[in-house]
Amino acid sequence: MMKLFTKDKDGHFIREINGIKLPFPLTEFMKVRKLGYILSALLMVISLFFIITKGFNWGLDFTGGVVFDTHFSQSANLEQIRSKLHENGIESPIVQTTGSVQDVMIRLPASNNDSTIGEHVKSMLQNVDKDIQIRSIEFVGPNVGEELAQGAVYATLATLAMVLIYVGSRFEWRLGFGSIASLAHDVIITLGVFSALQIEIDLTFVAAILSVVGYSINDSIVVFDRVRENFRKIRRLDTIDIIDISLTQTLSRTIITSVTTLVVVMALFFFGGPSIHNFSLALLVGIGFGTYSSIFVAIAIAYDVGLRREHMIPPKVDKEIDELP
């Protein structure tokens, strides 16, 4: 059986090394990195399978449709509005307030994109509020949705490229490679969950993906910085031991940060309403796997592609002393 916690010769868990106190017993994360690779590869293959076979359930932001800017004479009941639209055969409407509780934006799929839809919607909603006003109707064509989809892809790729440049310049290119692999891991699995469940993807999902990228890279950079610091402090240990010590040191910070963030995101998921439901779900999945990948993927891949002490700390060059009189 593989042991994760290291003991000293007296059988006690190691809690201090070279004067460095550890919040937990020294944990040998790198021993199980291959199991982590297998789990990550399995999850990514399953995610890619669903993405290829089922595709995505694109929202109105990408497929086009009709957007209504409406004003109610009293506080609008969003659930009642959705129910009334469903009763009249309109599927997947997006109903949310804009500014005040009386101003409501209604978005309908492209299948309802015709010249008389405004009067139909008004007659439906007059059963909810007879004094309803439709201030404007905007038709969004599929070409606009295609441009938004391309923009979302470009934004994600640009973010990954900037992360690679930043980590590679501040630390080392092997860490940049590990970071990109970790971020791709998080994004693909999140996309796979949405594809498998056929959850609607809109622009808020894109915002969630970019947030996950930022959150995950922040966790990884904390680990990278601690690895570099320990390379300077501890000279006699191998690279793999330094990484285990660094991960053990940052584990409490990683757990506390992740748990507190997930509690807030869960509150958004359960109590935030339909308009941010998919956004918060993407954050839940992405942050959860991002925490895992910052421990078991990013630094592990950097190590396996050759990360060593000399890559993080340049060798000292002795200065020549001019002894001429």
From Swiss-Prot:
Gene Ontology BP annotations: intracellular protein transmembrane transport; protein targeting; protein transport; protein transport by the Sec complex
Domain of life of the source: Bacteria
Localization: Cell inner membrane
A Pfam family the protein falls into: Sec_GG
Keyword terms of this UniProt record: Cell inner membrane, Cell membrane, Membrane, Protein transport, Translocation, Transmembrane, Transmembrane helix, Transport
MF (Gene Ontology): protein-transporting ATPase activity
The UniProt record lists the keyword Transport: yes
TM segment ranges: 36-56, 148-168, 175-197, 202-224, 254-274, 281-301
Main location: membrane
Gene3D superfamilies in the cross-refs: Multidrug efflux transporter AcrB transmembrane domain
HAMAP family, alphabetized: SecF_B
Family classification: Belongs to the SecD/SecF family. SecF subfamily.
Annotated NCBIfam families: 2A0604s01, transloc_SecF
The protein's name in its UniProt record: Protein translocase subunit SecF
